UniProtKB/Swiss-Prot annotation:
Listed transmembrane segments: 19-39
Alphabetical GO biological process terms: methylation
Full protein name: Probable methyltransferase PMT17
Cytoplasmic membrane side: 1-18
InterPro entries, alphabetized: Put_SAM_MeTrfase (IPR004159), SAM-dependent_MTases_sf (IPR029063)
Pfam families: Methyltransf_29
UniProt family annotation: Belongs to the methyltransferase superfamily.
Biased composition (Low complexity): 59-70
Region (Disordered), start-end ranges: 50-71
MF terms (GO), sorted A to Z: methyltransferase activity
Keyword RNA-binding: no
Keywords: Endoplasmic reticulum, Glycoprotein, Membrane, Methyltransferase, Signal-anchor, Transferase, Transmembrane, Transmembrane helix
């Protein structure tokens, strides 16, 4: 009996030792695993080096080709898919011809000539067909320099970056732009503000409240070099300035080089690419838009994008025609007839004329359509539109009717819901969400999104330190959703163009504008309406997953390269499989890139790709040199 107990004791002891050994080994495995994950999750120092190779004077280095190679990037993988090497060779993209250095794919003059001149259709967006697509890198001009930092950029730009003196000659009297040695200077003048944009805006502020936070978003039609928008920024008003690519060379390019929001666009046959009720203020200073023609169609479009209670400001012909008619080289009768026609259209839209003083005339859109509907019952033209597509604006034809406002029973209520004053507006729950117009979105989810973006921006500052140092002025978010990225960036000296893809499941651009932010619609299978090298940073979350079955991802990346300035930064969020595809493409585009972990850690399937476009410039080809020699002969 004792012998049996002794054997049992030894067996128990052996089991205990074995269990202790297993637990010990397991514990060590877990410890090393956690330590490894923690170590790998720290941000490699080389990521910081990615984004800070800014050349203080690129023109002093070789203008040929490329900046010095950055430090070798450390790639620490936390996903087996990331470890798979591909035997496929990287495709390296060649620079395009130097003559394409200002190429705008969907506003190409040669292509535009094929289209009808009626209602400026030939200057609208007309994108290249398949055999016209470019698979090359748009080159910067030979002596391209990194632009001035904001706020100095408001007043100065390098001549080598936009080598066009036409505006400085053509608009010399109007003080738009001056050439001073190797740079342009922007004195802040304009056709209708000879005392400068600042003084002009002060004149407006004496007539309507500009500084109480009620006016935040503005649209400037036919913007010139965007001095109006540039000086509104001092008043915390964010203007989207637009002008066509036309005889006034590079207006929008100058605006963006200054660090002022702008986009290529025109009042033509289609709606502007913005949702209904987007802007608190619309402005036209001698913008040459025929407001009175086509039954007032263009003013109906202004009415669509104006917020209830928003203002329309007009200066220049025909306003104050009694003083200026001789200088405008038009008859008094002609100018009076034009102004009367504009007054009639404004009245038919149920607008109220606020004032006309000096060179300024201001109208206000009603808060709601309660009274307007009563007027329209008598068949007064134009009617209120019957279709319910007020926010639809991508390649959508203009309509000769008044866009209906959301229903309200109280004549003192703002249709669609009142907005908070700025800056509270940025983080207040937008009325479109309160009213339930965005599927599967409510106030709680909106607030959660704001918290998510606080965490993401904190992470971005670690992997892109320049983000908090004022390095990036012009920023684009290619898939903006609710505008959380832009709202979280408000503390920095930057602005964000929030792009909502027309293919996105939720169309949220109206929400973005209700937050006091700006943006536009876009199909990323096409080119964006901007000049090359106009953005310092591009952000995109989930964009390539959205488009990978719709169009060639290479074309989207080449378009990003066209838009991005040399030494600009790209931050992409997506699943690791998609980012691996993207990184393989960008390695052939003169970009330095690295995939890093999600802010939640290495086990999240979503990763972040950080890339920097290297500095390089175009060079005249032998063919171009020969052509120049022949021209000189």
């Amino acid at each position: 009996m004792a012998k049996e107990n002794s054997g049992h004791h030894h067996q128990t002891e052996a089991r205990r030792k074995k269990l202790t050994l297993i637990l010990g080994v397991s514990g060590l495995c877990i410890l090393f695993y956690v330590l490894g994950a923690w170590q790998a999750n720290t941000v490699p120092s080389s990521i910081s080096k990615l984004g800070c190779e800014t050349q203080s004077n690129p023109s002093s280095s070789s203008s040929s080709s490329s900046s010095s190679e950055s430090a070798e990037l450390d790639f620490k993988s936390h996903n087996q898919i990331e470890l798979k090497e591909t035997n496929q060779t990287i495709k390296y993209f060649e620079p395009c011809e130097l003559s394409l250095s200002e190429y705008t794919p969907c506003e190409d003059r040669q292509r535009g000539r094929r289209f009808d001149r009626n209602m400026m259709k030939y200057r609208e967006r007309h994108c290249p067909v398949k055999d016209e697509l470019l698979y090359c890198l748009i080159p910067p001009p030979p002596n391209y320099k990194i632009p001035f930092k904001w706020p100095q950029s408001r007043d100065y730009a390098w001549y080598d970056n936009i080598p066009h003196k036409e505006l400085s000659v053509e608009k010399a009297v109007q003080n738009w732009i001056q050439v001073e040695g190797d740079r342009f200077r922007f004195p802040g003048g304009g056709t209708m503000f000879p005392r400068g944009a600042d003084a002009y805006i002060d004149d407006i502020a004496r007539l309507i409240p500009l500084t109480d936070g009620g006016i935040r978003t503005a649209i400037d039609t036919g913007c010139g070099v965007a001095s109006f928008g540039a000086y509104l920024l001092k008043r915390d008003i964010m203007a989207v300035s637009f002008a066509p690519r036309d005889t006034h060379e590079a207006q929008v390019q100058f605006a963006l080089e200054r660090g002022v929001p702008a986009i290529i666009g025109i009042m033509g046959s289609r709606r502007l690419p913005y949702p209904a009720r987007a802007f608190d203020l619309a402005h036209c200073s001698r913008c040459l838009i025929p407001w009175f023609k086509n039954d007032g169609l263009y003013l109906m479009e202004v009415d669509r994008v104006l917020r209830p209670g928003g203002y329309w400001i007009l200066s220049g012909p025909p306003i104050n025609w009694k003083q200026y008619w001789r200088g405008w080289e038009r008859t008094e009768e002609d100018l009076k007839k034009e102004q009367d026609s504009i007054e009639d259209v404004a009245k038919s839209l149920c607008w109220k004329k606020v004032t006309e003083k000096g060179d300024l005339s201001i109208w206000q859109k009603p808060l709601n359509h309660i009274e307007c509907k009563k007027l329209k019952q008598n068949n007064k033209s134009p009617p209120i539109c019957s279709s319910d597509n007020a926010d639809s604006a991508w390649y959508k034809d203009l309509e000769t009717c008044i866009t209906p406002l959301p229903e309200t029973n109280n004549p003192d209520d703002s249709a669609g819901g009142a907005l908070e004053d700025w800056p509270d507006r940025a983080f207040a729950v937008p009325p479109r969400i309160i009213r339930g117009t965005i599927p599967e979105m409510n106030a709680e989810k909106f607030r959660e999104d704001n918290e998510v973006w606080k965490e993401r921006i904190a992470h971005y500052k670690k992997i892109v330190p320049e983000l908090s140092h004022g390095r990036f002025r012009n920023i684009m978010d290619m898939n903006a959703f609710l505008g959380g990225f832009a709202a979280s960036m408000l503390k920095y000296p930057s602005w964000v163009m929030n792009v909502v893809p027309v293919d996105a499941e939720k169309q949220t651009l109206g929400v973005i504008y209700e937050r006091g932010l700006i943006g536009t619609y876009q199909d990323w299978c096409e080119g964006f309406s901007t000049y090359p090298r106009t953005y310092d940073m591009i952000h995109a979350g989930g964009l390539f997953s959205l488009y990978e079955h719709r169009c060639d991802l290479t074309l989207i990346l080449l378009e990003m390269d066209r838009i991005l300035r040399p030494e600009g930064t790209v931050v992409l969020r997506d699943n690791v499989e998609t980012l691996n595809k993207v990184e393989k493409i960008v390695k052939g585009m003169k970009w330095k890139s690295q995939i890093v972990d999600h802010e939640k850690g290495p086990f999240n399937p979503e990763k972040i790709l950080v890339a920097v476009k290297t500095y390089w410039t175009g060079q005249p080809s032998d063919k171009n040199n020969n052509n120049n020699n022949n021209n000189n002969n």
